A protein has these predicted regions:
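Alpha-helical membrane segments of multi-pass proteins
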Residues: 1-234
């Protein structure tokens, strides 16, 4: 809730809505890389199951937790809401800004659902699959629009180009900073999650190996061998 307030209220909310493309991009990162996954992680599984059952949303939640659905819809939202047309039209009024923020949050919930859904069976089961999904959906694809913003030689958004300058920051420099925020800002979250998944994978593999060895040892005990020999003699 604190991060949601920081992204929405003054000063970041005002700067992102009317003055700085870089603040706009920082809002996007907070909604999608922090608020969304923490929202899923903050819901106990029993509560999620009860809500899904009462509202008959279990099947729908399972479908939106598919990696193809989450990855495609998130990146569509990312590209659509950062197009010059969308920014210049939606950021000019309070309702449009609210709608854009809300769509970002929905996109974040969609893209993180296959990884941290509160309902266990809705998560991806393969650790390599989870890591590949995060790398592609949150690492590779967003780098494309980030590159356009970073290397564009002129302002793409009229609303930020015509806004009063903040601390003397030019519109082009501000836009380049926005591209860098989009490209680099999510790296700690994405790669931190990938490292955590690698550790979980290692621990799960170690536990499976220990269980397998324990079963083999149980089958190799003298009592088991004597029983096997007796059965063979009979």
């Amino acid at each position: 809730m604190l991060l949601l307030w920081v992204a929405t209220d003054w000063p970041l909310g005002l700067l992102g809505a009317s003055y700085l493309a870089s603040a706009h991009m920082l809002q996007f990162l907070i909604y999608t890389m922090a608020v969304a996954p923490l929202f899923w992680l903050g819901i106990p599984e029993w509560m999620a199951r009860r809500i899904a059952g009462r509202l008959r949303l279990y099947r729908l939640m399972g479908r939106i937790a598919q990696p193809v659905v989450g990855g495609v819809l998130f990146n569509f939202i990312l590209i659509a809401t950062h197009s010059p047309w969308a920014v210049d039209n939606f950021r000019t009024n309070q309702f449009g800004s609210f709608l854009m923020d809300f769509v970002w949050l929905i996109g974040g919930l969609l893209v993180w659902a296959p990884i941290v859904s509160p309902i266990t069976e809705h998560r991806m089961t393969s650790y390599p699959g989870r890591m590949a999904y995060l790398f592609l959906a949150l690492g590779v694809v967003p780098a494309v629009p980030a590159g356009f913003l970073t290397f564009a030689g002129f302002p793409l958004y009229a609303i930020y180009e015509l806004a009063p300058r903040v601390h003397g920051l030019s519109a082009t420099t501000d836009q380049q900073l926005a591209g860098l925020v989009m490209k680099l800002g999510g790296i700690p979250v994405v790669w931190g999650t990938i490292v955590a998944l690698m550790y979980q994978w290692s621990e799960a593999t170690r536990a499976e190996s220990a269980t397998f060895r324990a079963k083999n040892n149980a089958l190799s005990t003298p009592e088991r061998l004597d029983q096997s020999n007796t059965e063979a003699d009979q």
